Amino acid sequence: MSGVMCLKASDTWASGIRSQPQGCLGKWRSMRCKHTRMHLAHLGNSRQLISLGPPRTREDGSRISQQVEQSRSQVQAIGEKVSLAQAKIEKIKGSKKAIKVFSSAKYPAPERLQEYGSIFTDAQDPGLQRRPRHRIQSKQRPLDERALQEKLKDFPVCVSTKPEPEDDAEEGLGGLPSNISSVSSLLLFNTTENLYKKYVFLDPLAGAVTKTHVMLGAETEEKLFDAPLSISKREQLEQQVPENYFYVPDLGQVPEIDVPSYLPDLPGIANDLMYIADLGPGIAPSAPGTIPELPTFHTEVAEPLKVDLQDGVLTPPPPPPPPPPAPEVLASAPPLPPSTAAPVGQGARQDDSSSSASPSVQGAPREVVDPSGGWATLLESIRQAGGIGKAKLRSMKERKLEKQQQKEQEQVRATSQGGHLMSDLFNKLVMRRKGISGKGPGAGDGPGGAFARVSDSIPPLPPPQQPQAEDEDDWES
């Protein structure tokens, strides 16, 4: 309303100016400008001006207002963070305890930055708007040669029909192209010659000359260059020491300051820190500082070890479980030979003598021997399993013989089951020889095979005899 009233007032001022004499016209004009400025200043609020505009202007104004409100909220959030940080600083400002602050090397910003959004999100792109097209429905008039000739009589036109002379110059590249933008493009590289004016096409193979063998021989006969002075006059050059431009930092002289070791009640200085002189390398090597280790927290609490005390004496740990009893030897084992039975008997006698030497341990019950039940139970279980002559032990020599016999029997069975003529015969002869020599089983063990019976019926070969002289004479005759 104020804007409308201002316009009406200006109309009345204009009508008053027309009725006034011409001498006061400048004065009224200056007063009208001052009043207009005062009215515009009293409006103040931009929304009233926007509301008076067209709908497009009001829509743009509302979008700008929303953007301003959003920016104002962001500024308010930043102000809250600043006030919070200021409060933390004020809280630790008066304390005298040392505080370690580990700042993050990463800027406190989200991992994915938010893209800037335009305030005209709902506006339609003017490039996509469709504009009305008007199609003119008219046909082109045909060319009238007669009318053209009549007009040429009144309007003389000089048209040159002579063709333009072509540029047949041998030098230069011809006319300038349209895409050249600088003068340097016209010149040859590192020269002042204009390529489009003075440029001659040269054939690189036109002046090629092939060298003959005579010319090559003449070149090789040329003398060598003179030797350097260091060889001809045998002079030695002094080796120049290269200058070192590397900077080596130095500690220099540190002034001695006589100050007390402890300064109490200093404002802004922590009183719970102690600095110890480092005896390692100095500051001259300029080694990078080590990263401090941050404290780690564990949620699991380790339980303390509980020790049982009985009458002020520590109880020993529980004894280990006894081992399983030794497996009994099969009854089908062959009897021991007399050579191996003797040492076993001697060992049994020694065990009997040792058992008679300690009758208390042998006859006493298990609980009386050792009430703690540690190593005694283990030894007792070994004794009961056959430690004192109860076990049917065999010597190592007997075990080796048994294993060897088992391997030979398995080989004979494997070869006899195959049914091959030559293999069966060979194996049977081997077994027969072993039986004769006494190293293996006899021929009457009954092994299977195709020629087992035939080989059994073959008599042994007679011993070789010396031929007599009569036989030799008969053979010669």
Swiss-Prot record:
Residues 437-449 have a biased composition (Gly residues). Residues 374-396 form the WH2 domain. GO terms for molecular function: actin binding; alpha-tubulin binding; gamma-tubulin binding. One of its GO terms (biological process) is exocytosis. GO terms for cellular component: cytosol; early endosome; early endosome membrane; recycling endosome; recycling endosome membrane; WASH complex. Residues 310-420, 434-477 are annotated as: Disordered. Residues 362-477 are annotated as: VCA. InterPro entries: WASH1, WASH1_WAHD. WASH genes duplicated to multiple chromosomal ends during primate evolution, with highest copy number reached in humans, whose WASH repertoires probably vary extensively among individuals. It is therefore difficult to determine which gene is functional or not. The telomeric region of chromosome 9p is paralogous to the pericentromeric regions of chromosome 9 as well as to 2q. Paralogous regions contain 7 transcriptional units. Duplicated WASH genes are also present in the Xq/Yq pseudoautosomal region, as well as on chromosome 1 and 15. The chromosome 16 copy seems to be a pseudogene. Belongs to the WASH1 family. This is Putative WAS protein family homolog 4. It comes from Homo sapiens. The gene is WASH4P.
